[in-house]
Amino acid sequence: MQTFAEELEALRAEGLYRSMRVIKGAQGSRVELDGKQVLMLCSNNYLGLADHPELRSAAVFGVAFGVGSGASRLVSGTMELHEKLEERIAAFKGTEKALVFNSGYAANTGIVSALVGRGDAIFSDRLNHASIIDGALLSRADLHRYPHRDMAALERLLQDKGGNGRRLIVTDGVFSMDGDIAPLQDLVRLAKKYGALLMVDDAHGTGVLGPTGRGSGELLGVMDGIDIHMGTLGKGLGSFGAYAAASATICDYLVNKARSFIFSTSLPPAVLAASIAAIELVDSPEGKELREKLAANVALFKEKLAQAGFDTMGSETQIVPIFVGPADATMEFSKVLLEQGIFVQGIRPPTVPSGSCRLRCTIMATHEPAELEEAAGIIEQVGKKLGVV
């Protein structure tokens, strides 16, 4: 039997070993790493809210309710802040009700495995987040994965598979490693045509996309056609946790059936209060300004990369991949950039398929245009030196 140490050594030999880096201070557009200031190009803190004064103040207010929630909400009771946050999320997403989970992973595994089971069918985009796939496996429903954004292939599966059980179509709204957006209009149409529920994981769209930051569904004009809006509180909203926003019936069903909700101590008061403040801020004039600043930063950065000849893999959002290919070249690219003061992660298997390794750049509203221009120039220099462009 291969030992754990041998497996780790094999990962090192393949260039797939992972380790953590310690940063000092708060998450921001610049952080201190290994004793020097570096530009953060790998955070999902898209609007810069993780260190926003209003969220900090709200978290301090939340501590007045204690630092922990005691137990599962079904055991020790729901705190007022839980209800206030869920009411605010439901209003934000335009649904009857919402239910808060402890993380995006907990939400997806809990929602998917609760809504379907043996004899049911799940139709999932091949590039969906790992938590969706894990939820599908936990559900024991039949899992049918269609090629990325291929609606003709999905329709063939819907025609041929599923039997008489429940059908669930599930997709990322924004795909986390590619930065492209799901064809939600077509997904809504197919869900209605074939009697399926449609669930959209909008972790990377919430707070960022659409005229008022409601996400990819708002951007594409199909908010009402989505049955389950899943999203996170820890990316564009800068806090922590996740949610399902849906009909009252579905949310009540999840309270009774979603094991990741039932068997977990709930989010603490400081996080709940900060999350409420985040949604209020996204809905404010400042939120609009931040989205506009983010959009301008994204356009600038992509323009500079395109001029340098990089392949950004069809990104439509603030997630900007730079295609490299081999894992070793990708990690060398990341290493040299860090030496040059740019913190950006190389993405390797199992996160992406072998041969499709990339740098995953993420842009923030709080980046300064001059910083992004300088970063793009350094990326171009290093990319040419390494033969990527």
From Swiss-Prot:
Cofactors that this protein relies on: pyridoxal 5'-phosphate
Binding site for pyridoxal 5'-phosphate: 104-105, 176, 204, 232
Any one GO BP annotation for this protein: biotin biosynthetic process
Keywords: Biotin biosynthesis, Pyridoxal phosphate, Transferase
Catalytic activity reported: 6-carboxyhexanoyl-[ACP] + L-alanine + H(+) = (8S)-8-amino-7-oxononanoate + holo-[ACP] + CO2
Cross-referenced SUPFAM superfamilies: PLP-dependent transferases
Gene Ontology MF annotations: 8-amino-7-oxononanoate synthase activity; pyridoxal phosphate binding
Pfam families assigned to the protein according to its UniProt record, in alphabetical order: Aminotran_1_2
Modified residues (N6-(pyridoxal phosphate)lysine): 235
Gene3D superfamilies, alphabetized: Aspartate Aminotransferase, domain 1, Type I PLP-dependent aspartate aminotransferase-like (Major domain)
EC number: 2.3.1.47
InterPro entries associated with the record: Aminotrans_II_pyridoxalP_BS, Aminotransferase_I/II_large, AON_synthase_class-II, AONS_Archaea/Proteobacteria, AONS_Proteobacteria, PyrdxlP-dep_Trfase, PyrdxlP-dep_Trfase_major, PyrdxlP-dep_Trfase_small
Residues that, per the record, bind substrate: 18, 129, 351
Metabolic or biological pathway: Cofactor biosynthesis; biotin biosynthesis
Self-association and partners: Homodimer.
Function field: Catalyzes the decarboxylative condensation of pimeloyl-[acyl-carrier protein] and L-alanine to produce 8-amino-7-oxononanoate (AON), [acyl-carrier protein], and carbon dioxide.
Family named by the database record: Belongs to the class-II pyridoxal-phosphate-dependent aminotransferase family. BioF subfamily.
Protein's recorded name: 8-amino-7-oxononanoate synthase
